[in-house]
Amino acid sequence: RFTRFLKAVNAAGNGVEMNKFYLDQLSTHPDLTSPNVLDVLRELSEVATLAVVTNGFDRVQSRRVRESGILDFVEDVFVSEKMDSEKPNRKIFDAALRALGVENREHVLMVGDSLSSDVQGGVNAGLDTCWYNPNHAENPGKVVPTYEISSLEELYPLVMEPEELANVGLKNRRHQL
């Protein structure tokens, strides 16, 4: 892509080296975590199996996920490059659910910040979906999530039973940081 760009703007440079630099830099900026995400993941991982389904290059995404600190709380990470399919194609979700041993999709909630890939992908796979929309963006209405939240803490009542909600924040939980 950088070689084409350099040619299009009639500029000198090595597109292959630019692409390598871009991917290296991208993978060093996890930028996956919003405030409290690790706390929320810790709580949810006590009561549910969590996994990541992400589009991109395995080298980049695996490093980003690893450096974000979320690996302690997820069962697996499914990267589109390794899965030979990407969101919103249902095939990546089908493969991830198979790998996790999930048979009943009624017990699965796809949470994501992209209507076009995360939510549409979940819909395509027959899953309940939750659009994480912290900036209160307008939904153009083409993709309708099952739920919409603006803070990750809003996931607790969607995932947890009432008695589990009462334990949120207790220190005697399984995961400790």
Residue locations for each model-derived region?
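A metal-dependent, Asp-based hydrolase signature
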Residues: R1-Y22
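Alpha-helical structural context
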Residues: A8-V9, V47, A99
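Generic signal for short, ordered secondary-structure residues
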Residues: V16, K20-L23, L44, G101, ...
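Short, acidic loop-to-helix structural element flanking the phosphoryl-transfer center
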Residues: D24-A51
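Asp-based, Mg2+/Mn2+-dependent phosphohydrolase catalytic module
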Residues: L38, R42, A51-L177
